[in-house]
């Protein structure tokens, strides 16, 4: 299931510069800023590839997906595995996390496997040797610019519980390059099994 979220237009997104100063913008304004720099890349001091990476990082860090991921996870009646982009996002999404800097990762995975906890947030893709019994729901924050890796992550999540059907929820921002990445990541999957949800209005249900 692909969930299409609008970028927020409210100017409540606070960014901190390398010099330490802060300024307030909106998710939409910030995305437009990076897109305009890319469109005029021939006059920009930064290389095109650097600008692409900076725009991708901006998309990965907008808070709207974090709010929506929590909202979506709260709707699940079964245990859910959350794939985030970095350690901070994982820690914000769940009490129990699985990532390289968490010394309790394996213990948390054991609790999740046993059904003692219902939510586990991870950063990196789980290794091929890991299987999770009774896992039917996964939520992926971002498809990344590498569509092959994104497709592998989706396929891996679907195979974590090989004996049963699983549902993968993939979050994407409307009217951004995010949608292109998702489309390319899903090219190898059966279109009949892919559905789309416009997540407009969800922010009325989610605390900022």
Positions of PLM-derived features:
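Conserved segment of the helicase C-terminal RecA-like domain
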Residues: 156-187
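Conserved nucleotide-binding/hydrolysis micro-motifs of P-loop NTPases
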Residues: 9-11, 88, 126-127, 143-146, ...
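Amphipathic alpha-helical transducer elements in NTP-driven molecular machines
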Residues: 28, 66, 147-151, 179
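Interdomain helical connector at the RecA1-RecA2 junction of SF1/SF2 helicase-like NTPases
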Residues: 1-76
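Conserved helicase ATPase core of P-loop NTP-dependent helicases/translocases
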Residues: 79-84, 88-130, 149-150
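A short beta-strand element within the Helicase C-terminal
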Residues: 119-123, 127-145, 149-152, 165-171
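Hydrophobic/aromatic beta-strand patches that form the interior of the parallel beta-sheet core
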Residues: 1-5, 13, 96, 139, ...
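Long, largely alpha-helical accessory region at the distal end of helicase-like NTP-driven motors
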Residues: 194-208
């Amino acid at each position: 299931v692909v969930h299409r979220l609008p970028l927020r237009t409210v100017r409540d997104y606070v960014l901190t510069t390398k010099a330490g100063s802060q300024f307030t913008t909106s998710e939409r304004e910030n995305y437009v800023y990076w897109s305009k720099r890319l469109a005029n890349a021939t006059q920009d001091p930064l290389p095109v590839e650097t600008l692409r990476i900076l725009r991708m990082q901006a998309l990965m860090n907008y808070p709207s997906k974090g709010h929506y991921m929590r909202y979506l996870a709260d709707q699940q009646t079964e245990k859910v595995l959350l794939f985030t982009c970095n350690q901070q996002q994982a820690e914000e999404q769940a009490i129990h996390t699985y990532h390289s800097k968490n010394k309790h990762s394996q213990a948390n995975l054991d609790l999740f496997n046993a059904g003692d906890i219902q939510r586990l947030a991870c950063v990196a893709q789980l290794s091929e040797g890991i299987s999770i019994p009774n896992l039917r729901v996964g939520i992926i924050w971002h498809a990344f610019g590498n569509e092959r890796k994104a497709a592998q992550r989706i396929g891996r999540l679907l195979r974590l519980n090989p004996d049963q059907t699983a549902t993968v929820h993939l979050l994407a921002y409307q009217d951004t390059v995010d949608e292109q990445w998702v489309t390319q990541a899903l090219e190898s999957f059966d279109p009949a099994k892919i559905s789309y949800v416009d997540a407009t209005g969800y922010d009325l249900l989610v605390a900022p």
